[in-house]
Amino acid sequence: QRNQRLALLVLLLLLVVTGVVILMVRKGQKQEESAETFQETNDHTNYGPEEWMSQGAPYIDVQLLTPNEYSRPQLPLNGADYIAIHYTANPGATAQNNRDYFENLSISHEAKVSSHFVVGLEGEVIQCIPTSEMSYATNSRNVDSISIECCHKDDTGVFEQETYDSVVKLAAWLCARFGLTSEQVIRHYDVTGKECPKYYVDHPDAWEQM
């Protein structure tokens, strides 16, 4: 009887171990499938500005940065859980100026900073980094957020109407694309307490309206 009980216990233990292994394998497969789905969603091979516009996006000028450790490290985004809105803090600079600054960091090495998109003073939108990759913009949320830098004319940080309209349209399109809600559109301020985007930190009602 002891031998039978021992054999039964061993059998039960083997069944439990087998069950745990199967669950772990299935979990790993689901994670891989999820990652593959996210990468497919972000694959720019079969998509472009015209396709995106048909889906509700503003025109996006794709000027991807040269891979480098200071502005485009090519680290994978864990997932798009947030859309983070920033202001450039350099009044009068254009979207192209800011994009070129990010690009030049590969040479100057003065900082690690970048953004997925930059929206200009006239509403133009430049994409600097694929949405499947991480940007250096939102501190602890770099790993799971898509960042939008916004140009502004003066120190108040208020967006021009053209800039505002493009930001709203771009954020709405990204929300639709990644299944997000307006609650997942955040300010840099909401992550770190930094006064960014300045006008929309100083005027919470304007942020809520946006």
Where are the regions that the model predicts?
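N-terminal catalytic cores of peptidoglycan-degrading enzymes
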Residues: 2-139
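Basic/polar, cationic surfaces and motifs that engage anionic cell-wall
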Residues: 4-8, 24-59, 154-210
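Second-shell loop/turn segments in exported
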Residues: 71-72, 114, 150-161
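Soluble periplasmic/extracytoplasmic beta-strand elements of cell-envelope proteins
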Residues: 84, 147-149, 186
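Cell-envelope and extracellular/periplasmic
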Residues: 89, 141, 149-155
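A conserved beta-turn-beta hairpin within the catalytic core of GNAT-like acetyltransferases
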Residues: 144
